[in-house]
């Protein structure tokens, strides 16, 4: 049975993006260690999963990109979950139109490497709400938005996670992953957690220094996976 990994950037106050869908933080892609962590994760995927909006954003960038991220995004199979998308022109892409739980169940039963989901917010929220995520890999950004598109919304019950691993990079970002079972590959660096049957006394403590710096350049979702 394949695991489903939700991998995304997130602000320290829990938002995937600002209300205008921008990501007003440094994505860390200029840092070699962060780049390697992302590439290792992306290349290890058996399939990339995403909602319609994220698919349209990525499909407009990766097919013609010369970025190091382009090859795994173009070559590894992709599944876009949408009931309205008529066709998917990005090679190696198919559309899943059925019930989300049933579609994910079928994908998990297929042989191959883990499934990695990237968003957008509505898709990520649905995966969490239905209990379909086995592992969270969250690149926690040292930025607070105050309002935006949250990762968790309308959960039927509190979701308790067990910390497995945490790493902070020179950019200030802390990759954080919540997994239910298997460990991450040793080349991956992240804060990792697994589902916990009951609340933990202390999951993690992260300290950030406050600066007057603000990132005014909003990078598109497809800037990094």
Please place each PLM-identified region on the residue numbering.
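Short, conserved catalytic or interaction motifs in soluble domains
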Residues: 135
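Portal/gating segments that form or line small-molecule/metal binding sites
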Residues: 1-132, 142-201, 205-208, 212-214
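Short, intrinsically disordered C-terminal tails of secreted or membrane-associated proteins
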Residues: 216-224
């Amino acid at each position: 049975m394949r695991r489903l990994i939700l991998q995304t950037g997130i602000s320290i106050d829990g938002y995937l993006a600002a209300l205008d869908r921008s990501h007003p933080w440094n994505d860390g892609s200029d840092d070699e260690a962060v780049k390697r962590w992302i590439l290792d994760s992306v290349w290890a995927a058996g399939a990339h999963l995403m909602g319609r909006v994220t698919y349209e954003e990525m499909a407009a960038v990766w097919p013609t990109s010369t970025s190091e991220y382009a090859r795994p995004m173009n070559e590894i199979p992709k599944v876009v979950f949408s009931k309205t998308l008529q066709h998917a022109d990005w090679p190696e892409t198919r559309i899943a139109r059925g019930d989300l739980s049933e579609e994910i169940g079928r994908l998990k039963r297929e042989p191959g490497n883990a499934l990695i989901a990237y968003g957008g917010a509505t898709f990520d929220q649905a995966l969490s709400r239905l209990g379909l995520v086995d592992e969270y890999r969250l690149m926690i950004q040292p930025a607070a938005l105050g309002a935006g598109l949250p990762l968790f919304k309308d959960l039927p019950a509190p979701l308790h996670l067990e910390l497995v691993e945490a790493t902070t990079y020179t950019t200030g970002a802390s990759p954080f992953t919540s997994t239910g079972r298997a460990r991450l590959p040793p080349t991956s660096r992240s804060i990792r957690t697994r589902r916990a049957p009951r609340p933990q006394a202390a999951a993690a403590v992260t300290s950030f220094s406050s600066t007057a710096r603000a990132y005014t350049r909003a990078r598109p979702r497809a800037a990094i996976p």
